[in-house]
Amino acid sequence: MPLRFGGMDDRALVERQLGRSPRALLRLAARCPYGAPAVTEQAPYDDAGDPFPTTYYLTCPQLVAAIARLEAAGGVERWSGELERDPELAADLERATDEQRQLRRQLAAGQTGRDNGSSLELGIAGSANPRRLKCLHAHAAFALANPGYRLGERVLAEIDPLWPPECCCSGAG
């Protein structure tokens, strides 16, 4: 039985949050404080066998918009520079990247999709080089799904307030 929020099941609410049907959706990985979906976990491959390199996908409209503003203000470049200056932060990213790869192999359960498994070795946000950040949304989603991931948590710490005063999905259903 699907979980329900505001009269909608979670999948329908995620679809509404994204404005499209979610691709390769497996489950919810995190919720906002109000109980709405915030992060989904995706399969490494969609039904057609095409790679889907983002394991944890941010769906909360408030967070998606806030992180888009961070990226537009040079956040990817700034955090890439921080990784070069902070070896402990870089080591934590490497640990999370290894965790991401292990999870993707586990979720694939022996399937290799159209790419013969090459995307299973990609890092967070589908990055071939973990030190070259691509998408802060994916790092924030990883941190919400796996508390303790420092880079994602530091990105989230830039959003004030992290969550809106009331649920941004409260009009659903």
Question: Language-model segments: what does each one mean?
Answer:
Residues 2-173:
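Preference for intrinsically disordered or flexible, low-complexity segments
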